[in-house]
Amino acid sequence: QYYAEHIGIADIDKNFGAPIHEGDRDKARIMVAIVDWNTRREVGSGTEAPTGTWDPEETTSVDEGPIIAYGSLFIDQSSTGGKMIDVQLPLNFYDTKAKPSGLYQIVISCSTSAYGDFMAGCKSNILYVDNFEWVY
C-alpha cells in the first residue's frame, strides 16, 4: 500500500545526469528486486555525481552478480481521497531457471523522488508506504 501525499515539480537539479530537470514533474518510485549477489552493493550520492546506482529495468546484472527479477512502480501524481492505495508489483524475471545459490537477497526501495540519488527532484514530496507482502 502507498499514499503519495505530494508529488511535485522538480525544484532542484545538480546536473548529475538525472532524466528530469528543474520544472519537470517529479516521480516517486517503489521498486523490489530479487538478486543473487556475492556482496553488498555500495551506493553513494550527495554532493557529487552518484556512484553504484542501478536500475533493474535497464540492466540484468551488476558487478556483485545477477538481478533475477524486479518489480517497479513510478508514481507521478499526488494521491487523492486520503486512503492508502493497494498495489501489486508483478515481478519481471530475467532468469526463470536460476537455481538458488544461497545468496539470494530481496531489495526493497521506496523513494519520494525516483532520481534523488542524482540530486534532482522535488524537495517537498511526501510518500507513505505500509504492509509489504511477498505473494508467490
Predicted regions and their residues:
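Short coil-to-beta strand junction motifs in C2/discoidin
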Residues: 13-30
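A short beta-strand element within beta-rich, extracytoplasmic domains
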Residues: 1-7, 14-18
